[in-house]
Amino acid sequence: ICRKLASAPAETYHEAVQATWFLYVILQMEGNASSFSPGRMDQYLYPYYRFSRTRGMTDSDALEITQCLWLKFNEIVYLRNSGSARYFAGFPIGFNVAIGGQKDDGSDASNELSYLFLRAQALLLLPQPNLSLRIFRDSPQELLEAASRVIGLGSGMPQIFNDEAVIPALEAHGIHHEDAVNYAIVGCVELTT
């Protein structure tokens, strides 16, 4: 997979996850900075997931690939100087994955990956990535219940963000609707478009 990605775009879920990981390794090598956000991974990885499912990838395969990515996120440890370590000590460095929310047309954006990411969090209970769930009035009850069960495990995730408050607030600050509706979270709770 790594050899292929050196010269060709990803086609499968496994390849797309590996390409995503390469991006974050490069960012860390170049910037040694915290709070790089993978964003709405359940949206941009979904076409690769669907393609792979039609080619025989099982739920178990997809979960294992996702869990491997979650483990990789926990391998990066940010080196801080003594001044910033007093204020920002601790392991997490703010890789925030946003799931759910809505599409540009206002319909529900959750998909199989939204649930898969919740399951990976429930099984691993790792501090990274920060997993955030975007909700709104049309979020499926099943998704809310799945998230509630994961929250009940005590990892503090997923964090909950209300699209019905966030999107209008971003638009009130001059962010175009198509950008506001695709917001993600950086670090702990900071919004980005």
Question: How would you label these PLM feature ranges?
Answer:
Residues 1-193:
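Conserved catalytic cores of very large enzyme subunits
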